[in-house]
UniProtKB/Swiss-Prot annotation:
Domain ATP-grasp: residue ranges: 112-296
Matches recorded under SUPFAM superfamilies: Glutathione synthetase ATP-binding domain-like, PreATP-grasp domain, Rudiment single hybrid motif
GO MF: 5-(carboxyamino)imidazole ribonucleotide synthase activity; ATP binding; metal ion binding; phosphoribosylaminoimidazole carboxylase activity
Alphabetized InterPro entries for the sequence: ATP-grasp, ATP-grasp_carboxylate-amine, ATP_grasp_subdomain_1, PreATP-grasp_dom_sf, PurK, PurK_C, PurT/PurK_preATP-grasp, Rudment_hybrid_motif
Subunit structure: Homodimer.
Metabolic or biological pathway: Purine metabolism; IMP biosynthesis via de novo pathway; 5-amino-1-(5-phospho-D-ribosyl)imidazole-4-carboxylate from 5-amino-1-(5-phospho-D-ribosyl)imidazole (N5-CAIR route): step 1/2
Gene that specifies this protein: purK
Reaction(s) catalysed (UniProt annotation): 5-amino-1-(5-phospho-beta-D-ribosyl)imidazole + hydrogencarbonate + ATP = 5-carboxyamino-1-(5-phospho-D-ribosyl)imidazole + ADP + phosphate + 2 H(+)
Enzyme class: ligase
UniProt protein name: N5-carboxyaminoimidazole ribonucleotide synthase
Classification lineage: Bacteria, Bacillati, Bacillota, Bacilli, Bacillales
């Protein structure tokens, strides 16, 4: 794709006003762009950093057209929007990301089928439409396996681990509600991710390989650079993916590494990703900077420089009291509080980035500091 460069003062429309939209807006504004955001939550984080706010549901056609008419380019911060609605908008307005990636990736089945056709390394899977299909999954995959809903899952929602026959009932109940995909369970050594930006004329910029740890299915911390020898292999897998799926802007591919050190593609997020937040302080360009450069038609940096090894930690609602007590003593903690109105114990409320000469020591220090968040 080739498209015109936006000039200073042009307007970027963002569908979605969560923390990703907020950080996109902040990158856009420092480059001289104006921002309009559309979100159904009148207190969304992005509202208070945007030049204009449209309070509307994501399926409100009139509001989406208002956003498009008042924007020089439109982007989105998450994938759970209607691909049909997005397809209509791409015919009327400038949306470099397009609708194809959303159409493929918001459905776990089409995502896996596309990855399989692209010859990437993925775990064996079975389409689940009926309870009978679950029995076929047992035959093909064996125990244990994971049942995931085809649509709408994030942060571990819509997933069930089935270890034996006695745990099938919960899976049956899930399948009765909606179609699913069953995946073979992997004995995981490590989870990693690779954040990538594709720009005008297929320029491609890679961020360093990121090592991730989840707790209760929510990203807990990210260490960069990843303590793994799989970066080149991960890049090769991403190259296969980008030949199969149209991308413009920043996206992230998540991988599993098993105990035999084999790399598997897990899933793709077609927008900036939680594991890339460290890049705001730790890199010469953040994942949001490169996203804005891409969708506005600007040239991307040839390479991303990691300024220092880094540990990034998500901050949940239950972490904020401790953080408020400790923050003033630690000027080296780069704190981002997203501005969500309702504080819940397991809700992502912000993140914290620490640049360090010793990630292992820093990692252990933070685990001790955040009581109850260690393994």
């Amino acid at each position: 794709m080739n498209f015109s460069k936006l000039k200073f003062g042009a307007t970027i429309g963002i569908i979605g006003g969560g923390q990703l939209g907020k950080m996109m807006a902040q990158s856009a504004q420092k480059m001289g762009y104006k921002v309009i955001v559309l979100d159904p939550n009148e207190d969304c984080p992005c509202r208070y950093v945007a030049h204009q706010f449209i309070h509307a549901n994501y399926d409100d056609e009139q509001a989406l057209n208002q956003l498009g008419e008042n924007s020089d380019v439109v982007t989105y911060e998450f994938e759970n929007i209607s691909s049909e609605q997005l397809k209509k908008l791409t015919k009327l307005y400038h949306i470099p990301q397009g609708y194809q990636a959303i159409e493929l990736l918001q459905d776990r089945l089409t995502e896996k089928q596309t990855l399989l056709e692209a010859n990437t390394q993925i775990v064996p899977f079975v389409q689940i439409q009926t309870n009978q299909d679950l029995l076929k999954a047992i035959e093909k995959l064996g125990f244990p396996f994971i049942v995931k809903t085809r649509f709408g899952g994030y942060d571990g929602k819509g997933q069930i681990l089935v270890r034996n026959d006695s745990e099938l009932d919960e899976a049956y109940q899930l399948v009765e509600k909606q179609e699913c995909v069953a995946e073979q369970y992997l004995d995981i050594q490590k989870e990693v991710s690779l954040t990538v930006t594709i720009g005008n004329e297929q320029q491609t910029t890679y961020f360093p390989l990121q090592e991730n740890e989840h707790q209760n299915q929510i990203l807990f911390k990210t260490v960069v650079p990843a303590r793994s020898d799989k970066e080149n292999e991960a890049r090769k897998e991403v190259e296969k993916i980008t030949r199969a799926i149209h991308f413009v802007g920043t996206f992230t591919v998540e991988f599993f590494i098993d105990k035999e050190n084999n790399l598997y593609v897990n899933e793709i997020a077609p927008r900036p990703h939680n594991s890339g937040h460290y890049s705001i302080e730790a890199c010469d360009y953040s994942q949001f900077d490169t996203h804005i450069l891409a969708i506005t038609g600007q040239k991307l940096p040839q390479a991303i420089e990691l300024l220092k090894p880094t540990v990034m930690m998500n901050l949940l609602g239950r972490d904020l009291d401790l953080l408020e007590n400790e923050f003033s003593r630690h000027p080296d903690w780069h704190i981002h509080i997203y501005g969500k109105k309702e504080r819940k114990p397991d809700r992502k409320m912000g993140h914290m980035t620490l640049l360090t000469d010793d990630v292992n020591q820093t990692e252990q220090y933070m685990l001790m500091k955040f009581e109850g968040r260690d393994k």
